[in-house]
């Protein structure tokens, strides 16, 4: 297990050689709880620093469980279309090239699992099950307060359908089960046992259960992307705070946990930066990228 180091202990800025600074060519960022603060905003100093490192030739990647409509506005704020950045949406099930809008990788759930998963989920009290079109969130049971949190984060309307599986006539990158944490804690292992080898099922937040195509997580898709670019994991810094960031933090040459990260994420990281409300990403840039 990697041993985390606090920002106060590991004062690296004046210790890194120029060669070490140039080692890292890629910066990959989770969004909620990492790039954005508690107001879901990118602070001006962090935005300026991220644009600066792109101008200097670094590749910026945004990697999120959000749908593409929830990622793209932040990519535009960071001017990623100018500098060759990439967006990993749906926890890596879709990779989009910012400069062209081209989808260069896309994985969908097997359609025949949608109805049985839906039927299992609907037996749980108070939960919802949702997926996404390009413009809206589709609710299969009826929105709960966690559904509305997801809608607010992504600025998307919610439409409830009477027959969720029948309504999904298009490729589905992921389904999300919003619900009370204690309900999801019981549901998750049940679904994992039923769909072992078919689906990737995990919680991104205590109140969000992600249902993904087999083997899809942020690390898997980053590996595909880096390989296509002729780069390695050792050349990448990954920053995150949640359960769904674990794979990429363990995969990266430098895995960084936010001070506000889940405990298991901090335990897996090489370095712990400041919180998302204290410009933690700016701190990483100052220490390791300039």
Located regions from the model:
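Active-site phosphate-binding/coordination module
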Residues: 44-145
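Conserved acidic, metal-coordinating active-site core of Asp-based
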Residues: 116, 120, 124-239
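Short, Lys/Arg-enriched N-terminal segments with co-localized hydrophobic residues
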Residues: 9-21
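Short, structured coil segments at secondary-structure junctions
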Residues: 78, 83, 91, 195-197, ...
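Cationic, low-complexity basic patches in intrinsically disordered or flexible, solvent-exposed regions
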Residues: 3-4
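Mg2+-dependent phosphoryl-transfer enzymes with acidic/Ser/Thr/Gly-rich catalytic loops
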Residues: 22-26, 43, 210-290
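Asp-based phosphoryl-transfer active-site loop
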Residues: 25-38
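Short active-site oxyanion
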Residues: 57-61, 85, 174, 234-235, ...
């Amino acid at each position: 297990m990697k041993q985390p180091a606090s920002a106060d202990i590991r004062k690296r800025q004046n210790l890194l050689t120029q060669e070490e600074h140039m080692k890292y060519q890629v910066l990959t960022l989770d969004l909620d709880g990492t790039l954005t603060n508690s107001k879901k905003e990118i602070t001006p100093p962090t935005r300026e620093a991220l644009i600066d490192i792109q101008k200097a030739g670094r590749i910026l990647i945004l990697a999120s469980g959000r749908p593409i409509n929830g990622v793209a506005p932040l990519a535009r704020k960071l001017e990623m279309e100018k500098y060759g950045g990439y967006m990993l949406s749906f926890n890596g099930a879709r990779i989009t090239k910012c400069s062209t809008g081209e989808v260069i990788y896309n994985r969908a759930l097997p359609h025949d699992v949608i109805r049985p998963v839906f039927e299992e989920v609907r037996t749980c009290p108070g939960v919802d099950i949702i997926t996404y079109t390009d413009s809206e969130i589709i609710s299969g049971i009826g929105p709960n307060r966690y559904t509305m949190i997801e809608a607010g984060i992504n600025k998307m309307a919610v439409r409830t359908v009477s027959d969720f599986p029948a309504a999904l006539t298009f490729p589905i990158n992921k389904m999300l089960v919003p619900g009370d944490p204690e309900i999801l804690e019981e549901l998750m292992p049940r679904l994992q046992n039923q769909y072992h080898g078919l689906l990737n099922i995990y919680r991104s937040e205590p109140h969000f259960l992600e249902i993904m195509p087999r083997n899809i997580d942020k690390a898997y898709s980053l590996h595909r992307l880096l390989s296509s670019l002729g780069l390695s994991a050792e050349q990448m810094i990954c920053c995150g705070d949640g359960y769904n960031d674990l794979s990429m933090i363990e995969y990266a040459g430098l895995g960084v946990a936010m001070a506000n990260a889940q405990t298991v994420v901090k335990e897996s990281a090489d370095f712990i930066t400041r919180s998302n409300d204290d410009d933690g990403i700016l701190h990483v840039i100052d220490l390791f990228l300039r």
